[in-house]
Amino acid sequence: MGMTWKKGKLLLARAPKEARAKFVLKIKSLLRAAHAGREKLIFIDEAHIHQDADLGHTWSRRGQRYYVASTSPGLARVTFFGAYVYNDRKVGIWPAARGNALTAIDCLESIRAAFPDDRLRICWDGASYHRAEEVLERARELSILITPLPAYSPDFMPVEALWRWMREEVTYNHCHATAAALIAGADAFQIKANEQSDVIFKRLYVCTGLDPEQEKLRIS
């Protein structure tokens, strides 16, 4: 058997296999509804982006070390909400004080204000504040349907790819001295991304299947 040197890839073994299989059927149904124009399908996720640089490879002169200047912001970070409007191939990114029930409700209200006449469905993960009764009650008041992802299943969240893309463009080998500078970088990235709807559709791929070999490794 041929061997090669590989970097390990994290697999969340506690993800519930049965719930994941059911979600595959659900997401296929939701995508059909979105394609038919019956619902506006929106994926929502939160991320904590550090002001300090994410170090990585880049082109530099041979024989010279490549230095990335850092103002040493330490663990300073900004919480962002990210939205992927599947029907429109558009994304939204905005800062929040933190991820909690209040900011989740603000998110729902902003989404409804942006699409006042659409039948809305939001997919997000099972964070405790997403499941808070006041959040679910506000969603009902706003006539927003909520579909939670299975536990330990970030592979079903396309906004995870948005965060990777944003880090490549905004924090990769670049330190932001202030939160305001990082937020400005995120704003510029959002504008640039929304000029590339085809790239958004490809990069923010919505998972509609499971790898049987991977699912065997889960312990649930």
Residue ranges and their predicted role:
Residues 60-62, 140-141, 163-167:
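Short, hinge-like loop/turn segments at secondary-structure boundaries
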Residues 37-41, 160-220:
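C-terminal anion-handling pockets and recognition modules
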Residues 65-73, 141-161, 174-175:
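RNase H-like polynucleotidyl transferase catalytic core
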Residues 17, 124-126, 133, 147-171, ...:
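RNase H-like two-metal-ion nuclease catalytic core shared by retroviral integrases
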Residues 21-109, 206-220:
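Extended, low-complexity cationic-aromatic segments
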Residues 53, 101-147:
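RNase H-like DDE/DDD metal-dependent nuclease/strand-transfer catalytic core used by mobile genetic elements
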